[in-house]
A protein has these predicted regions:
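Non-heme Fe(II) oxygenase metal-center motifs and adjacent flexible, charged/small-residue loops
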Residues: 1-213
Length: 213
């Protein structure tokens, strides 16, 4: 992705951060952000729910087609609002060009609304998905990572401030060997997350490691 600071986006990150995380400030322009927020406003948001628990954030899911895997088959939060609307399709192509993958590789998109005080607990995205790309809009977010195996000290936790209009990519070790969380937001914030479908190799490796634990 080149050595330019704005392009690589890694120079402000701790050197001990595992491979696989790329952070890009200014991924969308202020004008693009304004248009995205206007397009997001009328979406049919619902409160995020995992099993019997409701979260503070509200979400809208989109799947590539009716056969695409849901985020969690046991999650009432896995509803789909249909195919991608044009504004998300355009953004998907921009994201695909950035990470050099086929736009058709993305099988899931998630739009999330974080009202002030909204956190996300520690988790790792479901193994049915591979590369994860997130775009931040409107407000700042603080994202954290820690080793997934549970053997870590507080000093091992890595923190990254997500600026409005920035984007990040998680793939490789940081996708499969780390989990992440979001600290409670201080202001209204939106995020758009795109996910590819995991390869059979990646899914098998993840399932095998979980079985071994």
């Amino acid at each position: 992705m080149g050595a330019d600071r704005r392009q690589a986006g890694l120079f402000d990150l701790p050197t001990r951060l595992p491979h696989g995380l790329v952070y890009q400030p200014g991924f969308v322009t202020p004008e693009e952000e304004t248009a995205l927020l206007a397009a997001i406003a009328p979406l049919p948001f619902r409160e995020a729910k995992f099993r019997e628990y409701f979260a503070k954030r509200r979400v809208v899911h989109f799947h590539a087609d009716e056969h695409a895997p849901s985020y969690d088959s046991g999650d009432a939060d896995s509803f789909s609002s249909g195919p991608l609307p044009p504004f998300l399709s355009d953004l998907k192509h921009k994201v695909a060009a950035w990470v050099n993958v086929d736009p058709a590789s993305f099988v899931h998109a998630l739009v999330s609304e974080y009202r002030p005080g909204t956190p996300i607990g520690w988790h790792r995205d479901k193994p049915v998905y591979g590369i994860v790309i997130g775009i931040s809009l409107a407000g700042f977010g603080r994202m954290r990572w820690r080793p997934y195996d549970g053997r870590f000290d507080r000093k091992d936790i890595v923190v990254l401030d997500l600026e409005p209009r920035s984007a990040y990519v998680m793939q490789g070790p940081i996708r499969w060997e780390w989990q992440h969380s979001m600290l409670a937001t201080r202001m209204l914030r939106y995020s758009i997350t795109f996910r590819t479908q995991a390869s059979e190799t990646a899914t098998f490796r993840t399932q095998a490691s979980e079985t071994a634990r």
